[in-house]
Amino acid sequence: MDLENKMKKMGLGHEQGFGAPCLKCKEKCEGFELHFWRKICRNCKCGQEEHDVFMSNEEDRKVGKLFEDTKYTTLIAKLKTDGIPMYKRNVMILTNPVPAKKNVSINTVTYEWAPPVQNQALARRYMQMLPRNKQPVAGSEGAQYRKKQLAKQLPAHDQDPSKCHELTPNEVKQMEQFVKKYKNEALGVGDVKLPSEMDVKPGDRSSLDGGDRGTTAEVGAVEDKSSADKKEDYSCYCCKQSMKEGDPAVYAERAGYDKFWHPACFICNTCSELLVDMIYFWKNGKLFCGRHYCDSEKPRCAGCDELIFSNEYTQAEDQNWHLKHFCCFDCDSILAGEIYVMVDNKPICKPCYVRNHAVICQGCHNAIDPEVQRVTYNNFNWHATEECFLCSCCSKCLIGQKFIPIEAMLFCSVECKKMMMS
């Protein structure tokens, strides 16, 4: 019965988002179909985050599980039905005040996430300081960006063994210990405040609880009540530029409250992307997203994208691979001991390379085997043989000789060129 339930869960996982269009490949993709272990679409090879898959509840569960058994439990709520922790992200709805007139609709803007602060004017100013294409306004490019970063920065398979492929009991135990360790030592959530508010060290930090799941506020101005008493030159820990008076800053408790960042500077040290929902990992004086923090601690399989907890794994092409996952990216055949070619940083077996990726010889019009020599000029290729790399007029072999190129044609002399072109 347990096996049946596990198989059912696995099936449901692979059905999620099935058929969703790819936002990157458009009509070239037949629709999302999850590869059995690669975590990409079998049709177009793009990740699930590149497809138009509705993942709101799934992402809230993932972040909820991340915050479980941490000091950030105020940001989650457990469902009464199954006890699954759900992320209580703060949804902010801003209402622009308009003159009292008849038949005038109220202009509202909904942010799918906003910093959980009580001063909503401060939260609004925080949003204004982000690049417009990264502001998570519902239905916008920024909302799509946030969704993509949730998938990229916080992979479910970096924290939940059940999301991984065929872990041994020992690997499950190692992963659970690893997750517990980074929750205790590195995980944090940014806090938004005015720098001047931090002149006095807080004896009791303001609660991280975002309150109700949805918050409505009127647009107003940010008011810094303490700025009149004392003005300081505050500089961003990332860009070293000064903070403008009245502008909010982001703090990371694990970094210490003497450090703060512009909202747009609160980024991962490796990928330089905004830390999604201000969720960070602190290590050696640097901010990381979840993915790149884990990469700094454990090898990651370039095949399945999971962290490697086994003592035995393969290293090839400056990447790490589970032994069973060093496979052809096109056909999944094992490549150990086989000839392969790297295409876009992915290993391809020789038959698939010749069939799908090989360049075509302009001389014989056949695919060029990856193991044979070839001549390349601009975007044209030839076998480096007497039969293929020759003058288009007199058929003289041009290997080691000067030649005159005209598109895909080659000439040994001006005379041959004139004769052929006349």
UniProtKB/Swiss-Prot annotation:
Q: What does this protein do?
A: Scaffold protein that may play a role in cell adhesion, cell spreading and in the reorganization of the actin cytoskeleton. Plays a role in the regulation of cell proliferation. May act as a tumor suppressor.
The family line of this record is: Belongs to the prickle / espinas / testin family.
Species this chain originates from: Monodelphis domestica (Gray short-tailed opossum)
One GO BP annotation of this record: negative regulation of cell population proliferation
Q: Where is this region: Disordered?
A: 135-162, 194-226
Q: Which domain of life is it from?
A: Eukaryota
Q: Which UniProt keywords apply?
A: Cell junction, Cytoplasm, LIM domain, Metal-binding, Repeat, Zinc
Q: Where in the cell is it found?
A: Cytoplasm; Cell junction, Focal adhesion
Which segments show compositional bias classed as Basic and acidic residues? 194-212
Which residue ranges does the record assign to the PET domain?
92-199
Q: What is this protein called?
A: Testin
GO MF terms held by the record: zinc ion binding
Instruction: Report the main location listed first in the record.
Output: cytoplasm
